[in-house]
Amino acid sequence: MEFSGSPLTLFCCVFFLFLTGSLAQGIGSIVTNDLFNEMLKNRNDGRCPANGFYTYDAFIAAANSFPGFGTSGDDTARRKEIAAFFGQTSHETTGGSLSAEPFTGGYCFVRQNDQSDRYYGRGPIQLTNQNNYEKAGNAIRQDLVNNPDLVATDATISFKTAIWFWMTPQDNKPSSHDVIIGSWTPSAADQSANRAPGCGVITNIINGGIECGVGPNAAVEDRIGYYRRYCGMLNVAPGDNLDCYNQRNFAQG
């Protein structure tokens, strides 16, 4: 290709091509605006308290703050992680049956209904507990201990706390990220607890104390339903070990 512009113009053009090429390989190359809106199609329903809060731009800005999120491994691993993240967070924020189509009520809520504790659940992952607010705030450089409501009033911060929780191992729990991309190897304790790689372990990480090891229950079924829907939209197989019915929760060792 012949180029007749100045060296500065040439540099700018090359930089632009490099930048747009890099962005094309990011999470936005899989989660487009249209796909985001179709996945979370009822989030702006007038019956939803979160109406107008969760935006595509806020999600992309937050995701880009965590370079490995939705960009690790091959295309299948990336798509599966996105499906798992939105499957879990859609359950956490579900508004139930907003339409005849099942598993389309995600991202209806920002705040937990029970707000008796200052650090009640907020955002896509329903971040709770002062310790989590402090750790998340340190990671994203926000004072969430003194300003916890930032998680419910700033959509980018809200998504950042959810992705931080997703990407970060805690105590004896692996990160949800490592589980879904296949980087986690169960320890002897995990094997004894029936914790095998798959979305069931992610449910155990997020809410195992209530939902895991107690047999079949509606909450786990809802998480699986959302995950399967998003896997279908992303053209990826959901894999094995989707529930945690027979898993010991992490608090039990």
From Swiss-Prot:
Residues 1-24 form the signal peptide. The active site is at residue 92. GO terms for cellular component: extracellular region. It catalyses: Random endo-hydrolysis of N-acetyl-beta-D-glucosaminide (1->4)-beta-linkages in chitin and chitodextrins. One of its GO terms (biological process) is defense response to fungus. It is found in: Secreted. Changing residue 199 to Y: In strain: cv. Samsun. It is an enzyme of class 3 (hydrolase). Its EC number is 3.2.1.14. GO terms for molecular function: chitinase activity; endochitinase activity. Disulfide bonds join 212-244. Keywords: Carbohydrate metabolism, Chitin degradation, Disulfide bond, Glycosidase, Hydrolase, Pathogenesis-related protein, Plant defense, Polysaccharide degradation, Secreted, Signal. It comes from the Eukaryota. Induction: By TMV infection. Defense against chitin-containing fungal pathogens. Belongs to the glycosyl hydrolase 19 family. Chitinase class I subfamily. This is Acidic endochitinase P. The lineage of its organism: Eukaryota, Viridiplantae, Streptophyta, Embryophyta, Tracheophyta.
